[in-house]
Structures are given as C-alpha cells and as structure tokens.
C-alpha cells in the first residue's frame, strides 16, 4: 500500500517529516522490548476449563459410541426402556446416529406419518447445540416424507419432494424420539420406519481423539492436553474468541511442569468450586421451592456454563420449545432427597401436569452423583401420564417417592427409591404450554413424610 502526502503540505512539510525521522534518537529507532506475558489467573483457568469441558463431554461420548460399534450415517434403533446413560427419557423410543456431511453430500432422512404421538428428529453439533428438529411443529406443511440435512451452501441436487434443511456443521449427532404412549409396539413400529442415508459419498471426518475420563469424574489439567483437537470443531456461537484464546494460552503454558502443576491445582480448587456453585441452578437458571429450571437448554448463545452443565448431567438435551425440564433436589425443609426417606408431591387440581404439556409429562428419580436411575425390584423408573394414576377428591394429584409403597397409596402414584442413595427428581413437559412455556410455573414443594 502506498501513502501519498496531501498536495497542500508542499515540499516544506515533506522535508520536515523526513528530517524528523532521520534525527530521531537511536533508542527510539530500535525495536522496543517485548511486553511481559500476561499472567493467567485462576479465573482465566476456571473459565477456560468450563468452556473446554463442554466440548470434551461430547467428544468423549462420540468416541464411546464408535467404540461400541456405531458407524457414520447409520441410524441405530435402540430398544425402549434402556437406562444405562445419565438422565434417560424413558417415555420415548430412541434412535441414534453420527452424521458426516460436506459440500457435495447431504444426509437424507425419511420420516413416517405419525399421528397423535410425539416425535422429533434432533440434530446437534459437536458442542451439544441443537441445530434442527424435524417434526410437524417445525415443518407443518411437510411433517413427514423426505428431508435432506445439508451443509450450508452445499451444491447438491435433491429430489423435488425433499425438504432441504441447511446446518452450519459437518459433524452432527442425531437423536430420533418417538413417544411410547400406551402402545409400545406401535411406537417401535414407527421408530423403525425412520430411515437415514447419505445422498453421495461424503468425506467422513475423523473421530476426535481426546481425553476419555470415567463416568462423572472430572479431569484436571490433562483436559488441556486435548485442547487443540477439541477446538478444531467450530463453535457457532459469537463472542467465543476470548475464552478460546484462554484455552489455547493455558494449553501452551502447561508445557512448563511448574505451570502445569499450578493449573491443575487451580482446576481442583476454583474451577470445581465454580461448577459446584453453579450446579444447583443449572448455570444461570432459577431455583424455587427445591426445584431448579435452567435459563436455556438446547441452544445456549454465549452461556457456555449452562451448556457444559447440561452436557455433564444430561447430554443431547433438546430445546425448550420441545421440552422443559425441572430438577428437584430438596424437600420443603431444604434437605437433599434421601432414598431411605418418604416424600410426597401434590399438584393442585388447577395445575395438573397434563394441563401444561401438549404431548406428555413424566417424572424420574436419578442418583444425584451419577445421574443414573435408582435401581428397584420393580424396574419402575418413572411416573408419567400413562400410569394408572388415582386423583384426590378435590381433583389434585399426589405422587409418592419412597423405598416401599406407603399404605393406602395407589400403586401407579408411587415411584420406588433406593435406600442410601441421594437422588434428584427430573420433571419433563414435552410440548410445554401455558405457565410452563412462559417460565412462570414451578412445581410444588416436595414434602418429607
């Protein structure tokens, strides 16, 4: 780039500028010494760790899925009722896939006609962000038939009757959900009619090889050893550059053994403490009467704290337009729920859970540390609108949570708990409406009996 002096300055001004440069002291002409590196604070470490952890939870699950035999662009239909992952939704038939797309190949999806039953096909990116749902709510003019999920701006020729959906990611996690309802066999029949196939021959991505840590045991400084690989997946949310820069700076700094030890200590003190502090309200959520409701789920914007907590406690959560979750962990006295004790939860007749869901509601009890369902001899892990519920004379509904069925309580109103286990309740509203959808509703207090 050339730089020209304005003509109005004339030769005198030009001569003055040149002379001034030539007469500058030698010290000014030399390159100044580099500024000292900015110290990485404990808060920097905590922010970077929480951000990175959200991605590592996804890559851990991806590696485990492929280790278990999953293949790219293949939809796997799971047997209903499986409970071997955190916070399972026991009211749907799941199908799962990992999808790879590129500029020349989309993923084609066949959706059967589903009547009077909840269903959706959810697509998430490598950070746990929901990019799309296929259902009659999102596509009322094309609720079933042929769909194609394509990389944005991909040049792909598709059949005329295909609904194209553009997404900003090459790697996608897919979950298809079909409500079980009263007729599980019909739900399974519909589940197996969902199909998936690539439109061409996509260049499949490599499964990222990042740290795999056990269960809910969080890693320490070793998380940053996977930073370079983890950050290769674009984060679609704006404003993440600063925290990503922190992640990269820490990943470089821990090459020094002393700094590595300091970062590890900081993670185990401040980062873990920050996570523990945020967990009761699920990040930036709201707590009331022993229940917590997250501020956002499924799509997170700049709220990476909530994203990480959701990925940790119930990965692949959908958007609040589809489902709203409440987590109950304390009784009316502020004490944690104990599987040895007995509790009750009464919904007033004018606020029955069925009145606040377009599709269905359910409540599940899970271990407070592992997030797995509580084992019991009945293999009963949830209560929902399909249970044989008995209502009180005033129209209210009382549910009971206890290791053995309380006297004079209908069997359908009782959810068994496990003695000695601290647990939480997860209340789901699918197709939320009314005060649940607006955020004004909170469940009643849980009473210790």
Question: Language-model segments: which ranges?
Answer:
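Selective for proline/serine-rich intrinsically disordered segments
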Residues: 4, 23, 30-34
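C-terminal segment of classical bacterial N-terminal signal peptides
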Residues: 16-27
